[in-house]
Amino acid sequence: MFMQDSDSIGIVSARRVHFDTPLSLKSRAVLDSYELVYETYGELNPERSNAILVCHALSGNHHVAGVYADNPKNTGWWNNMIGPGKPIDTRKFFVIGINNLGGCHGSTGPISINNRTGKRYGPDFPLVTTSDWAKTYVRFADQFGIDCFAAIIGGSLGGMSAMQLALDAPERVRHVAVIAASARLTAQNIAFNDVARQAILTDPDFHGGDYYSHGTHPRRGLRLARMLGHITYLSDDSMASKFGRELRNGSLAFNYDVEFQIESYLHYQGDKFADLFDANTYLLMTKALDYFDPAQDYDGNLSAAFARAQADFLVLSFTSDWRFSPERSREIVKALLDNKLNVSYAEIPSTYGHDSFLMQDDYYHQLVRAYMDNISI
């Protein structure tokens, strides 16, 4: 039996919305129709002015808060942030979580059936970008009669998605919270993504992305990709504090088996992820990260790119995040200030690295709460 805490969303369920209007993508491909899976928390007010959209990161999904009745251990990935009395208070806001187009948790993506062929899309599913997602967010809002989001919020890739909506449809959002994100990937980050992709692409079970029809899954490649990614999400201090050089069995074995606790942890994370995620979706999501660069059409001038934005911004970074360092957030802040937009910025002390945006941290949560409390609905 599930025991609900007073500040918990409680039991939730996912829903699905179908779109028949063709969607033209940035790649020039067209989806004749598609579906998005989503969850909502709280109540949409009569004015439809209290909606908040939460955008997920690379491996995230629509299950942002609460638990499922048939799987109470599957807690939403931002459950510590969203709920009655929490920083994003569902007594005030109507919070929406969407599994992005191209995802593998119910929204149309590589594992979905292509109505034209009767088979899974697989590698034929077109690459999608944050601009494509922004289009789907607007269409989703239209389904609910939401003319303007009170806020759009996201961490990591989710923060990039939030920025994209603020640029592509500035009239559709009043506040934007960009957390542990960047206005573009550095060469180092693109390199990390490519190595992760190569681990999948060179897995013998990948079969050019058509592993579904072969009855296989590139588990080894996906596992390695996740292990690499997980290293970049942590900080050296957090790894040292949690694992150090601790051995699994207390002594060296003088072989190539897993000996150190950090190795065991990475193998566990890789195995768990490979059981839950689709490899084609992983490839697609890393490309969405690589392609995000709003300044590209403005000769690299980020300030010029943000001239379209109208919303107020909250930008947060974490001191130990070396994947999307505070310097990247300060670049965003400068571009916003150059356009005389209202922006609040904080660099939060943390030892957890990039994953800090998911953690329970009093100062971090106080900052989010204070900002959200000041949003009028």
UniProtKB/Swiss-Prot annotation:
Site (Important for acyl-CoA specificity): 323
Active-site feature positions: 156, 321, 354
Top-level lineage group: Bacteria
GO terms of molecular function: homoserine O-acetyltransferase activity; homoserine O-succinyltransferase activity
Quaternary state and interactors: Homodimer.
Keywords: Acyltransferase, Amino-acid biosynthesis, Cytoplasm, Methionine biosynthesis, Transferase
InterPro entries membership: AB_hydrolase_1, AB_hydrolase_fold, HAT_MetX-like
Function: Transfers a succinyl group from succinyl-CoA to L-homoserine, forming succinyl-L-homoserine.
Domain AB hydrolase-1 residues, every copy: 50-358
HAMAP family per record: MetX_acyltransf
Broad class of the protein's primary localization: cytoplasm
Cellular compartments annotated: Cytoplasm
Enzyme class name: transferase
Binding residues annotated for substrate, in chain numbering: 226, 355
Catalytic activity: L-homoserine + succinyl-CoA = O-succinyl-L-homoserine + CoA
EC code: 2.3.1.46
Protein name: Homoserine O-succinyltransferase
GO terms (BP aspect): homoserine metabolic process; methionine biosynthetic process
